[in-house]
Amino acid sequence: MVESATPADRRALGEAIRKTVPRTSHAAWSPPGDRADPVALLTEQDTDRLQWLVPIRHSRMAESAFTFYRGAAKIMATDLAGTPSTGLSAQICGDAHLSNFGSFASPEREQIFDINDFDETLPGPWEWDLKRLATSFVLAGRDNNVGDNDIREMTASAVVGYQQAMARFTTMTTLDAWYAHLTLQQITDAMPKKKDRAAVEKSAAKSRSKGSLRALGKLAEKVDGTFRIKSQPPLLVPLRDLPSEGNPDELGRVAERSFAQYKGTLDDNRRVLIDKYRIVDIAVKVVGVGSVGTRCFIALLEGNDDTDPLFLQVKEATASVLETGLPRSAYSHHGQRVVEGQRLMQAASDIFLGWSAGDQGRTFYWRQLYDMKGSVDVSKMSARRLKVYATLCGWTLAHAHARSGDPFAISGYLG
């Protein structure tokens, strides 16, 4: 963005880009003759993962076209690198499919709806995120046996929701646009049907119950008077039970060093808070689809006593799949890349976000495991509800891009 340009100038810039990159140029895609082998791209990702978890990744991706898509961010990033680009950049998610949106607690304890996965985040073309979001609705609709007309409508709802939200942000002050956010209460109030309002309220109530104390009962058990994370291989495996990852005591020491580094990345006030806790156990925990096989841990921390738990997730951060077609991150530490990107894109972020290094040059980021986190079961959504959800996702993605990009130029291009 040119700082001296007026809003009218910036909007005109977006409109002018239509002449060189027509909006219709985004409508079609066909694989080039030299397209990278999709299977080879997935296999390449597998080489540095925990090999005993790779089959789980493959089985989860094989469940349906949509679940394959969830794990295929690298394939799509490689394909998008050869598509027309507006040249308008923003901090982008890199994996903005519909299941990477959800609810969680803001630091002010509001339940808000936002993007919740930033493993691939990098500055890049805003339209890449929008294309990944729109395509995810096509595939989810097909998996749900939704008709073609409804699929077109829900996909259009995502794009129009983005377009209208971006236009709306140009009418706000800079600060108002920055602070804009969607709460579950706002979403509930906006639902036109009573049964839809009831569904959101039920989901919100379920999410409110998700915290570290509930997770303690689900993920841990008392052993000799002390809570320890349960062993539920292969999806949940404490360090003490890892099959081939080295000496458990040494792994524990690495974890403690990593924890100390992580605390050093927090703001002073939050470091004071985390210093009130100590780690009592750590385990490998399988999460998601595309992330399966990366080194993802959960740490059980204890505050005043064993009725005062805190669960943190410690997730390996590797190079963004977007680096296939974009410059490398300005951050050499990929954990920091994820955290800084998340803070820039989200309306409100987890107070415990931070990063650290492990052994062998690996990088990680830390966040709360459960803090009123909620998500929708897309497989059970009707076409009508998918359309509503698509509009919410479109608004949310537009807001994430407007925070770092130029809403006037993007809105000018979209019209």
Sequence positions of predicted segments:
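Basic, amphipathic N-terminal segments
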Residues: E3, A8-R11
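Conserved ATP-binding subdomain of kinase catalytic cores across diverse folds
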Residues: R10-A16, T20-R23, G33, D37-C93, ...
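Long, low-complexity segments enriched in small/aliphatic residues
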Residues: Q185-A255
